């Protein structure tokens, strides 16, 4: 069983913003594999289903970004998920739009949602897919809570589709294979 967590903020005003790319990812996986997030628990919305032969739980924390670790910890404890069976998807300002990176461990890199997950789990060793949203030329908060331009949104949709393939690869073949295959990806 895998726990797949997309990070974002709840509420209509955050829908499809740069900081909600993790929610966009979960929406795409949910649609592709017909997994409905119609249950409320773990301080968030979740659904269970299958991606190929892999049983998965898709989770969107409902705690706002900075407290995402509370939701993740509750789901991890309930399902007794091992760290290598939990995959977190989130935005990264240090990666250009049109790219993403897969990592199996690492610091929060200034991302408050990841910082809170590390705090709540007591480890930074867990797989993650970091989707590039580009570096701002303006105030960071305004940038991450802003929406993509029309052209950038088109590119983000392509990146999301490829990052779903990366998720499938992680589950089927392991994170090292996925990192070797996808970390050079660029539109």
UniProtKB/Swiss-Prot annotation:
Active site: 19
Catalytic activity: an N-acyl-L-alpha-aminoacyl-tRNA + H2O = an N-acyl-L-amino acid + a tRNA + H(+)
InterPro entries for this protein: Pept_tRNA_hydro (IPR001328), Pept_tRNA_hydro_CS (IPR018171), Pept_tRNA_hydro_sf (IPR036416)
Recorded superkingdom: Bacteria
SUPFAM superfamilies: Peptidyl-tRNA hydrolase-like
An individual GO BP term: rescue of stalled ribosome
GO cellular-component term (any): cytoplasm
Subcellular location, principal: cytoplasm
Binding sites annotated in the UniProt record for tRNA: 14, 64, 66, 112
Pfam families in alphabetical order: Pept_tRNA_hydro
Enzyme class: hydrolase
Keyword tags: Cytoplasm, Hydrolase, RNA-binding, tRNA-binding
Keyword tRNA-binding carried by entry: yes
Subcellular location: Cytoplasm
EC number of this enzyme: 3.1.1.29
Function statement: Hydrolyzes ribosome-free peptidyl-tRNAs (with 1 or more amino acids incorporated), which drop off the ribosome during protein synthesis, or as a result of ribosome stalling.
Homology family: Belongs to the PTH family.
Protein name per UniProt: Peptidyl-tRNA hydrolase
Gene this chain is encoded by: pth
